[in-house]
């Protein structure tokens, strides 16, 4: 019987163990998509205590706490960090079977070095004091943790109107060797149905020094901001798409009219929203191709389901779930609009509903080519799927319907500096899967063949994919 979270955690066979310890473990982390606040890296934030660094902004943990009956005051309310931490300690023993239990103990092990101690109300005070002592040292600041975890690149998520002042400051700081690069998140520019759309057009126009009245004004403003992002090292865009919309792109005069009507406060039809969204996203995709950027499409979240809690806490507070709208037709046509002129950028497609895995794994095969290995990617198990079964499903389906060897691997998609252990979690699951294939005779049990593939999936593929500009 194995002990919990031993050195061979999740590694069920000898080949898996060798793949992980000899090939995966020491690979650097190329965290190409996250939601870290770059200001906290610039300022090298020193966290006051374990409760603060662990629970601040982590809606995964918040959902678990609510399900365990913890009152909101102890989750997002005005309770002290210690009281929130103790509420989390009360919750964790109830999360057995949920990845939260694994993540919690992995995060205590790395970087804090706490092993052979289960987190519970009985051990919480001891762990609180031990971790707080470490958090007061230079090795456990925001930058210190990134360096301890061997992070070489973190791609943040940034609005086109952002100044990127913090990314500039980090890039100019020779004392810090981790790249923190912006990623372009233009959702508010193509989701014309949003209540805040007109206000956002005003803000975008101000930053770009363009009065946005016509469709071409919008494209000019976006183009200025694209240049700004590119000059600050941006290599990726990310579109959050709850509903994939596609409609044939109308004339520029029609797009001008749609924009004018929306800016005046008129509500547009679903078809008109689809026409506008398609026009903007296709234009953006072609610009990404020209710039040598990667386009990421995160598809299928159903957001802000609780009106009451949205009004109380706002977005990204743990009230989102998996959507179930079909989107294969719309996605194929959206990508094809760019591909018809050979201007589809390197693209990563993520789906939140695992029902769509096989569809996505076959969709990427429609648009490969151009001499680029893995040009269009089926992204790693996202959000509700970044757990053992979800990540294994995604990789097995990719291997059966595409090329696992070209996969760009894991990303944290997280707001927490302690989430880098998710790369370890992913790597263990990857090595166990490949090791199992070898032990079953499904692939050659040859580490000279399997080892380099594992290394590439853990690091090399992502580095090449995001750093090549062609």
UniProtKB/Swiss-Prot annotation:
InterPro entries for this protein: Metal_Hydrolase, Uronate_isomerase
Gene Ontology MF: a single term: glucuronate isomerase activity
Any one biological process term the GO annotation gives: D-galacturonate catabolic process
Key word Isomerase present: yes
EC number annotated for this UniProt entry: 5.3.1.12
Record keywords, A-Z: Isomerase
Metabolic or biological pathway: Carbohydrate metabolism; pentose and glucuronate interconversion
Reactions mediated catalytically: D-glucuronate = D-fructuronate; aldehydo-D-galacturonate = keto-D-tagaturonate
Family statement drawn from the similarity comment of this UniProt entry: Belongs to the metallo-dependent hydrolases superfamily. Uronate isomerase family.
Name of this protein: Uronate isomerase
Gene: uxaC
């Amino acid at each position: 019987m194995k002990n919990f979270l031993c050195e061979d955690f999740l590694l069920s066979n000898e080949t898996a163990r060798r793949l992980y310890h000899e090939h995966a473990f020491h690979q650097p982390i190329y965290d190409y998509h996250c939601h870290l606040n770059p200001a906290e890296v610039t300022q090298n934030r020193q966290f006051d205590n374990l409760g603060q660094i662990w629970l601040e902004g982590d809606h995964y943990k918040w959902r678990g706490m609510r399900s365990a009956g913890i009152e909101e005051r102890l989750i997002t309310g005005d309770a002290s960090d210690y009281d929130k931490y103790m509420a989390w300690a009360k919750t964790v023993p109830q999360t057995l079977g949920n990845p939260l239990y694994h993540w919690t103990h992995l995060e205590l092990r790395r970087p804090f070095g706490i092993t052979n101690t289960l987190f519970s109300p009985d051990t919480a005070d001891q762990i609180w004091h031990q971790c707080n002592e470490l958090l007061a040292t230079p090795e456990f600041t925001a930058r210190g943790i990134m360096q301890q975890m061997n992070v070489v690149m973190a791609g943040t998520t940034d609005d086109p109107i952002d100044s990127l002042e913090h990314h500039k400051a980090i890039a100019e700081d020779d004392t810090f060797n981790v790249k923190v690069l912006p990623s372009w998140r233009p959702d508010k520019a193509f989701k014309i149905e949003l209540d805040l759309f007109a206000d956002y057009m005003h803000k975008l126009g101000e930053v770009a020094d363009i009065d946005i009245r016509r469709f071409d004004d919008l494209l000019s403003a976006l183009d200025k901001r694209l240049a700004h992002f590119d000059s600050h090292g941006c290599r990726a865009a990310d579109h959050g798409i709850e509903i994939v919309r596609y409609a044939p792109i109308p004339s520029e005069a029609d797009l001008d009219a749609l924009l004018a009507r929306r800016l005046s406060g008129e509500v547009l039809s679903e078809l008109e929203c689809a026409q506008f969204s398609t026009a903007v996203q296709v234009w953006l995709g072609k610009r990404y191709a020209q710039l040598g950027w990667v386009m990421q499409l995160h598809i299928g979240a159903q957001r802000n389901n609780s009106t009451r809690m949205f009004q109380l806490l706002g977005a990204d507070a743990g009230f989102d779930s998996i959507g179930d709208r079909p989107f294969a037709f719309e996605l194929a046509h959206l990508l094809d609009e760019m591909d018809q002129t050979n201007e589809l950028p390197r693209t990563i497609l993520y789906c939140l509903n695992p029902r769509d895995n096989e569809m996505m794994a076959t969709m990427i095969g429609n648009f490969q080519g151009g001499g680029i290995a893995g040009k269009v990617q089926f992204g790693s198990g996202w959000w509700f799927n970044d757990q053992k079964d979800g990540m294994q499903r995604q990789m097995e389906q990719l291997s059966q319907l595409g090329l696992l060897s070209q996969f760009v691997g894991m990303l944290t998609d997280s707001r927490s500096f302690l989430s880098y252990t998710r790369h370890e979690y992913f790597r263990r699951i990857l090595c166990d899967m490949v090791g199992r294939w070898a032990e079953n005779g499904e692939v050659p049990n040859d580490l000279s063949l399997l080892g380099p593939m594992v290394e590439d999936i853990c690091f090399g593929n992502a580095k090449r994919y995001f750093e090549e500009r062609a």
